[in-house]
């Protein structure tokens, strides 16, 4: 991902304020609600029967936190996203058979959740920088797909 120095600073400054537990669960939960076909990858998560069930599901929250912790690793390695996400790309491709388009969907949902949480602080410039980052992460996660 090519970010200017200003964009990198904006991304890392805002990320320092993110509550990974809260935002991760909310982003993954919203993905599962808005794009219900993504639920098929989470059969073992129990009750995903309604928006309330999904948003309150402890397994969704825990996995959302895990996802955002990985995203944090990516933010520390913006110049080597493919290397950073190589193992996760392989896992999601070869073992889990996740449609790589879902990575883009989750990235866009994450941007919406960040905008909701940070309001005016999530300026158009910050949003543009985050859009670049989530696109880069989605691309890196899709790298092992044929």
UniProtKB/Swiss-Prot annotation:
InterPro entries: Globin (IPR000971), Globin-like_sf (IPR009050), Globin/Proto (IPR012292), Hemoglobin_b (IPR002337), Hemoglobin_oxygen_transport (IPR050056). Red blood cells. One of its GO terms (biological process) is hydrogen peroxide catabolic process. This is Hemoglobin subunit beta. GO terms for molecular function: haptoglobin binding; heme binding; hemoglobin alpha binding; metal ion binding; organic acid binding; oxygen binding; oxygen carrier activity; peroxidase activity. It comes from the Eukaryota. The gene is HBB. Belongs to the globin family. Involved in oxygen transport from the lung to the various peripheral tissues. The modification N6-acetyllysine is found at residues 59, 82, 144. It comes from Phoca vitulina. The modification Phosphoserine is found at residue 44.
């Amino acid at each position: 991902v090519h970010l200017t120095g200003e964009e990198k600073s904006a991304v890392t400054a805002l990320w320092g304020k993110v509550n990974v537990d809260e935002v991760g669960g909310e982003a993954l939960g919203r993905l599962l609600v808005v794009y219900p076909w993504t639920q098929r990858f989470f059969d073992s998560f129990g009750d995903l029967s309604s928006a309330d069930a999904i948003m309150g599901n402890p397994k969704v929250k825990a996995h959302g936190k895990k996802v955002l912790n990985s995203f944090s690793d990516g933010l520390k390695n913006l110049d080597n996203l493919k290397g950073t996400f190589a193992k996760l790309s392989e896992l999601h491709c070869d073992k889990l058979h996740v449609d790589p388009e879902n990575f883009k969907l989750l990235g866009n949902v994450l941007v919406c959740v960040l905008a909701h949480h940070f309001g005016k602080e999530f300026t158009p410039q910050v949003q543009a920088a985050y859009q670049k980052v989530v696109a880069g992460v989605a691309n890196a996660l899709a790298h092992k797909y044929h």
